[in-house]
Amino acid sequence: VAKSSVGLEVGSSTVRLATVSRSRSGSVIEHLNSIGLNPGVVVDGEVVDAEALSGAIRHLVKVGKPGGKDVRLGVASQRMVARQVDLPWVPPKEFKQALPLLAADMLPMPVQDCVLDFLSYEDLVDDDGAHVIRGLLVAANEQSVLDTVDAVESAGLRVVSVTLTPLSTLGALADPLSPNPEALLDIGHTMTSISIHEGGQPRFVRILSRGGQDITAKLAEHLSIDEEDAERWKLSLPVTWPTMNAADQSATETAMRTALADLVSDIRTSIDFYATSEGRRPGRAYVVGGAGATLGLLPILASVLRIPVAVGTPHVTRHGKSMSADELAMAGSPASASAVGLALGAA
């Protein structure tokens, strides 16, 4: 009998809901839906208007037909950090209790205000001969997480787990057999996360305060139009591009390169930092997120990063028979990866 799980991604402009069923024959995406949020409901990953968010989620549940009330929640904000650290070895039974003390000096915020997790992937002996555990330390502001959980549960759902969204997405897309590190670029409305894994293990996560909204603002400035018109123009490009003459295409390329320059530069800086500190570069990158389909983004990233860059799609490739045309279209877009990854519980 197939078992289903539900992933819920709360972004700054959109909430996405995915139901994935699993059986011996594999995983199947059964339903995939989203709803837009009004500006100011969620700002940079922080819930500002809990009532409006709950209302949007209730409406999404009505149309999204999730496979149950239990959801795996994905969150990301500027008040969350994830970094590779070496911690002193502690017996496994004592580790959870000891983690706040071990991590206190490694965080940019008070440890007592945080929810902590540690993804260990290597036991080793350091240069001083001490036994240490290497892994990814994840910290999130506790009140920020609770605000999101409360809004979700006020909509009639039960949150069974909370995951830093980039980690669940990475788990759904990463190739554990890749001989080289891989980068996942999740480009949202106001934030972009950069995650790098090696052999399926997350080694690096950085959250940037730039996203699709910044691309639109740069376009508006370059084209001397307001941001609403710039957003409409940006979204129409996949349709209008093939009909443009050579001069218009050249002007469009210039506009997009200008609009993408700051975001692409920040992404390159983050990947260069990883390459310098670890002594190896990612062999390829995948792009997901609501702004991941921006025209020109992939070739510009590939040129600047000097590695292959492709749209990221979850390992689940089978779609349920009851999926609508809109759901199938969403399943093929880079925006779907996070919600599906959460439903898979891959983090």
Q: Which sequence ranges carry the predicted segments?
A:
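Adenine-nucleotide phosphate-binding core of ATP-dependent small-molecule kinases
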Residues: R232-R284, A291, S338
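Phosphate/pyrophosphate-binding loops at sites that engage ATP/ADP/AMP, CoA/4′-phosphopantetheine
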Residues: I57-K69, A155, I225, R268-R284
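Glycine-rich phosphate-binding/hydrolytic loop that grips phosphoryl groups
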Residues: S168-G171, Q213, A310-A347
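Glycine-rich phosphate-binding loops at beta-strand->alpha-helix junctions
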Residues: A259, R280-A310, P314-V316
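Glycine-rich phosphate-binding loop plus the immediately following alpha-helix
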Residues: Q143-G171, Q201-P242
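A short acidic Gly-Thr/Ser loop motif
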Residues: A2, L8-V15, A76-Q78, L184-T192, ...
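Active-site neighborhood for divalent-cation/phosphate handling
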Residues: D70, G74-P176, R284, P314-K321, ...
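Non-catalytic, solvent-exposed interaction/assembly segments
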Residues: V1-L102, L146, G156-R158, N180
